[in-house]
């Protein structure tokens, strides 16, 4: 099993390799390998298990009634997926989780995580705290995305998102965690329209950009002195 991925996971924050190994049986841990393109979790079905990526990567996708697929997220070693659905247990998944390459996933039983073991060990309590923190962080990330995709125009969406990134960096010069296609998907716009608007914004003197690096001339320098950790 990939100890590095387990140690990097927010679920096991603060735990040693030995402590994690001792906790896994209590959490109903079950590893499984998937081939590229194989469906890990299917929309329309419930799950009591959350997944932790050990090797490779997985995609979280939504398919509409016409068959159009929208990429909602990507999970890499150490990342969790489907934890909110697993904790709700009776909620049907609205998304598919698909292996983007050969991967190994560790499934964890949400009911066994949320129910204290008979020894009421400190390690189990830490896992619950870490899970709540992870759920809160992902909820805030969804709230930020809703804020950035709320404006009607592409320019307004870009200014909203890039303004936040400048604030997080504590500088007018910053690098975003997306390439151009990923940024278009995140803001829910067409890539060509996004590229055209960025070109217009550069001509208007609002910013300069190269790939994922930006320098804003339109926003005031952030007043805080400590950069905000980027959770996107």
Predicted regions and their residues:
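Glycine- and acidic-residue-biased ligand/ion/polar-headgroup-sensing regions
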Residues: 37, 48-61, 76-78
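Phosphate-/nucleic-acid-contacting segments
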Residues: 154-157, 161-232
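Short, Lys/Arg-enriched, Trp-marked, Pro/Gly-tolerant hinge/linker segments that flank
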Residues: 122, 142-154, 167-173
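Short phosphate-coordinating micro-motif centered on Lys-Gly-acidic
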Residues: 39-45
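Long, hydrophobic or amphipathic alpha-helical segments
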Residues: 125-128, 132-142
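Short, small/polar residue-rich loop motifs at catalytic or cofactor-binding pockets
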Residues: 26-27, 45-47
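Cyclic nucleotide-binding regulatory module and flanking cytosolic helices
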Residues: 1-36, 85-88
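Cyclic-nucleotide recognition modules
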Residues: 71-129
């Amino acid at each position: 099993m990939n100890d590095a991925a387990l140690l990097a996971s927010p679920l096991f924050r603060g735990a040693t390799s030995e402590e994690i190994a001792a906790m896994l049986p209590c959490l109903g841990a079950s590893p499984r390998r998937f081939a590229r393109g194989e469906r890990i979790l299917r929309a329309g079905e419930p799950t009591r298990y959350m997944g932790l990526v050990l090797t490779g990567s997985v995609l979280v996708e939504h398919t509409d009634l016409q068959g159009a697929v929208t990429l909602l997220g990507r999970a890499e070693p150490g990342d969790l997926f489907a934890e909110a659905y697993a904790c709700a247990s009776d909620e049907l998944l609205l998304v598919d989780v698909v292996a983007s390459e050969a991967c190994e996933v560790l499934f964890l039983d949400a009911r066994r995580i949320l129910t204290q073991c008979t020894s009421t060990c400190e390690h189990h309590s830490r896992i619950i705290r870490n899970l709540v923190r992870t759920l809160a962080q992902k909820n805030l990330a969804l709230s930020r995305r809703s804020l950035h995709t709320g404006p009607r125009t592409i320019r307004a969406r870009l200014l909203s998102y890039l303004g936040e990134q400048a604030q997080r960096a504590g500088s007018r010069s910053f690098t975003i965690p997306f390439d151009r296609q990923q940024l278009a998907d995140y803001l829910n716009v067409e890539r060509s329209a996004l590229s055209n608007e960025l070109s217009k914004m550069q001509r208007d003197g609002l910013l300069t950009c190269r790939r994922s690096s930006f320098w804003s001339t339109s926003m005031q320098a952030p007043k805080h002195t400590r950069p905000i950790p980027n959770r996107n």
